[in-house]
Amino acid sequence: MADGIDRRNDDRLEFSTSKEVTVAPTFEDMHLKESLLRGIYAYGYESPSAVQSRAIVQICKGRDTIAQAQSGTGKTATFSISILQVIDTAVRETQALVLSPTRELATQIQSVIMALGDYMNVQCHACIGGTNIGEDIRKLDYGQHVVSGTPGRVADMIRRRHLRTRHIKMLVLDEADELLNRGFREQIYDVYRYLPPATQVVVVSATLPYDVLDMTTKFMTDPVRVLVKRDELTLEGIKQYFIAVEKEEWKFDTLCDLYDTLTITQAVIFCNTRRKVDWLTDKMREANFTVSSMHGEMPQKERDSIMQDFRQGNSRVLISTDVWARGIDVQQVSLVINYDLPTNRENYIHRIGRSGRFGRKGVAINFVTSDDVRILRDIELYYSTQIDEMPMNVADLLS
């Protein structure tokens, strides 16, 4: 567990995986560059997780790869290590491109690549919206081996010819379910059109609904699959509960009651819209509760500063939209409250996966009005899980 990956159930994971995939039990067995191995060990990894031991070698062989694994299993390091193995740092041109659905995730991936590539003199730039375009242009003109970005800004930089694509050999789509939802689909096609025809494509996500798998056929050739069966995807160690609140207006009082009874280390409260986030934040502050909030419409600098405060533990309770739910590592989070149930059932696992990340125990509490009962049952069926009514002693479960 020192390396931050929960391996307790690796032996029980069922892999619906291509026949040709072999397991590499150690990083040495993957025949990685010496400088990369040094970075991997310095980062704190000792041995590969289940998904790493299956996917890295296939990606390094140049195979198009679909890797599905739950939060906290080392997905980001899977493609980061693969990228660092295949790039040539002597050529200062962009050779790998990673697309993510949120700016925070793109920035986090950049920091993982820089850390793992610490002994390789690698250049990696986070190319994201909401930041200074001039800085992007300067960094890209200087030459970056890897670019981690959001689809809109990356497509823009390619169109302006600052992000040169002729040397790109790998495209990674992280959190592919969210990326390929309607919002980003066109922008991904835009980017893909500019890439060399032989570009390798790697798709990584905790959830891969069938329509997404279907779509990947458009830009993947005979992909290798490393898939964890879906009903394994509700994270063990997370206790899931619901509170019946009958009416929407009662949710606020319920939340205030919870504040008094729970001694929380850190908590995230999810709402479905940015307007609701702002409204709830104001209401909580009026009631003298200290909370911070974040959503996609905030300026990037403000979002960065809120994330940093939360990471460092300076702020204890964060109210957010789903922009926060995707892949952000904050290890102290022990409680997630779905003030609103997610409108997209795939987002449920991304939200609650936050609370038990890296094998930490966590509690997820869903506020359920009479209108929400059907959605809750749908989530239970989809993930083959059981969500019980919250017991009185919920504070004990967090301690």
Swiss-Prot record:
One of its GO terms (molecular function) is RNA helicase activity. Residues 56-226 form the Helicase ATP-binding domain. The keyword Repressor does not apply. GO terms for biological process: rRNA processing. ATP-dependent RNA helicase involved in 40S ribosomal subunit biogenesis. Required for the processing and cleavage of 35S pre-rRNA at sites A0, A1, and A2, leading to mature 18S rRNA. It comes from the Eukaryota. Its EC number is 3.6.4.13. InterPro entries: DEAD/DEAH_box_helicase_dom (IPR011545), Helicase_ATP-bd (IPR014001), Helicase_C-like (IPR001650), P-loop_NTPase (IPR027417), RNA-helicase_DEAD-box_CS (IPR000629), RNA_helicase_DEAD_Q_motif (IPR014014). It is found in: Nucleus, Nucleolus. It catalyses: ATP + H2O = ADP + phosphate + H(+). PROSITE patterns: DEAD_ATP_HELICASE, HELICASE_ATP_BIND_1, HELICASE_CTER, Q_MOTIF. SUPFAM superfamilies: P-loop containing nucleoside triphosphate hydrolases. Keywords: ATP-binding, Helicase, Hydrolase, Nucleotide-binding, Nucleus, Ribosome biogenesis, RNA-binding, rRNA processing. GO terms for cellular component: nucleolar chromatin. This is ATP-dependent RNA helicase fal1.
